[in-house]
Each structure stands twice: as structure tokens, then as C-alpha cells.
């Protein structure tokens, strides 16, 4: 049994439209689940709001990794959770997991986001205040033990 990561999303029940010809959840829905779950954290907890985007800044996904360890089938309950694993001047590294009802690790997601100047369409530094807020969030949601799995993606430390 694995503990969820600090940011927990509401459980999701696998519906018929999420299943494919193999009668299990299609890979598209794993990505969608991860994306929807960490987007809430990104907007609500990390303050990447519509106002921030209107100010000319956002983030773009630079790289993703998904590992599928156990299948989900129709009616199964999925428990998504996330962690802001690392931050530097320009990048964010998130880790997400999907647990099944038995608390077993079913999927691992990692993503690296680059901070973007929407006018130049290029990766740019976070403002000092935003960087400090992100570092503070990461510190207050620190995980004391190592992940029970290897990480595939990495960003440079500050």
C-alpha cells in the first residue's frame, strides 16, 4: 500500500466511455485524469490563474512520462494525487500517481512545465516573488521519504 501524494484529487470512477476494446481504461484517460487533477493544483494552490495568463505569462508542457503498472476497469475507483517535486528559475517538475481501491500504485505521471512569456513565446524566468511562492509551497508540502519508485524526469536544482 502506498500513501497518496500531498495534493489529493477527488476519486474518479471509470465509466464505459473511458474503456476501450480491451475492456479497461484507455491510455487517453490516464493522461486526461492526470492533467485534470494537477491543473486544479496548478490554478488553485500555485496561483496560475486566468489573470496571470492575461498578464502575458503561462506555462507550456515540455516533457511528460506515464508508466502504466496496473489496469483500471469499468466501475473501478481511481485515486489521483500530486506533488510539486522541484522548481527552478524557469521550470516546474510535477509527479502524480493513480492509486486503486487497495492503495496499490497503478500509474505514475511526471511532467516538466516551462514558464512562458506569451508575447515572446519563449521560456523565461519566474518573477522573484512567484519563484519564492513556488519554493514556499514546495517546502510546505515536502515529502519526508523517498518515492517508492524511480523518477524518469529531472530538472536542475536552484
For each feature predicted by the language model, list its residue ranges.
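Hot-dog-fold acyl-thioester-processing enzymes
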Residues: 2-61, 117-158
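Hydrophobic beta-sheet segments that form the core/acyl-binding groove
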Residues: 65-101
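Conserved GNAT-family N-acetyltransferase fold
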Residues: 34, 96, 109
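Residue-level signal for glycine
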Residues: 103-105
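Long amphipathic alpha-helical scaffold regions
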Residues: 100, 111-118
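Hydrophobic core residues within well-ordered beta-strands of beta-rich domains
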Residues: 8, 60-62, 78, 92, ...
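Generic short beta-strand
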Residues: 16, 96-97, 113
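Short hydrophobic alpha-helix segments
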Residues: 109-111, 127
Amino acid at each position: 500500500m502506498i500513501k497518496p501524494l500531498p495534493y489529493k484529487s477527488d476519486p474518479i470512477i471509470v465509466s464505459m466511455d473511458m474503456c476501450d476494446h480491451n475492456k479497461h481504461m484507455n491510455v487517453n484517460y490516464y493522461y486526461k485524469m492526470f492533467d485534470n487533477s494537477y491543473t486544479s493544483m496548478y490554478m488553485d494552490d500555485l496561483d496560475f490563474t486566468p489573470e496571470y495568463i492575461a498578464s502575458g505569462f503561462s506555462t507550456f508542457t515540455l516533457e511528460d512520462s506515464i508508466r502504466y503498472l496496473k489496469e483500471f476497469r469499468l466501475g473501478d475507483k481511481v485515486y489521483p494525487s500530486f506533488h510539486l517535486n522541484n522548481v527552478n528559475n524557469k521550470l516546474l517538475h510535477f509527479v502524480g500517481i493513480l492509486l486503486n481501491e487497495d492503495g496499490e500504485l497503478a500509474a505514475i505521471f511526471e511532467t516538466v512545465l516551462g514558464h512562458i512569456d506569451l508575447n515572446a513565446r519563449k521560456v523565461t524566468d519566474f518573477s522573484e516573488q512567484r519563484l519564492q511562492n513556488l519554493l514556499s509551497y514546495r517546502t510546505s508540502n515536502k515529502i519526508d521519504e523517498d518515492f517508492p519508485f524511480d523518477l524518469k524526469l529531472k530538472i536542475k536544482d536552484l
